[in-house]
Regions:
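Alpha-helical cap/lid subdomain in secreted, periplasmic
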Residues: 1-106, 110, 114-132
Length: 132
């Protein structure tokens, strides 16, 4: 963890790693009596080498480390969506994002939701029975 002083308030704040926050989320969900499923981040609309960029060496790695440690179900939305965007193609995928490379349009959000449904079915989640 790191301690930072906030510019406006001058108060100090402790900031933990991404993995720490994932584990905290999992713990909080279990404490509420629910069953967590980790879902990775959506891919960015960046296309080095003709394919949508995968971030499996940073966020993807951190998700997998937490999943290995906690044995929580993991839906790899990042790669499921990136694979489908590769098939759609770089030019057409521009319609799925707003003006930046991170935030999707409504069309992109709907596409990502379909990818979540596909992932839930593939992992044989109990939630899959509620999907079309």
């Amino acid at each position: 963890c790191n301690v930072y002083q906030m510019q406006e308030s001058k108060q100090f704040e402790v900031v933990y790693s991404f993995g720490w926050y994932l584990k905290k989320f999992i713990q909080d969900v279990y404490e509420k009596g629910a069953h967590p499923i980790l879902v990775s981040l959506t891919p960015r609309n960046e296309w080095p080498h003709g394919k949508m960029e995968r971030r499996n060496d940073t966020y993807g790695k951190w998700y997998r480390e937490v999943v290995a440690e906690t044995e929580v179900p993991f839906l790899d939305l990042h790669n499921i969506a990136a694979d489908s965007y590769d098939k759609i193609g770089k030019e057409k995928v521009k319609e799925y994002y707003k003006k930046d490379h991170t935030h999707t349009s409504l069309k992109g959000a709907r596409h990502n939701a379909k990818c979540v449904a596909k992932g839930l079915k593939k992992m044989k989640s109990p939630l899959a029975k509620y999907l079309k």
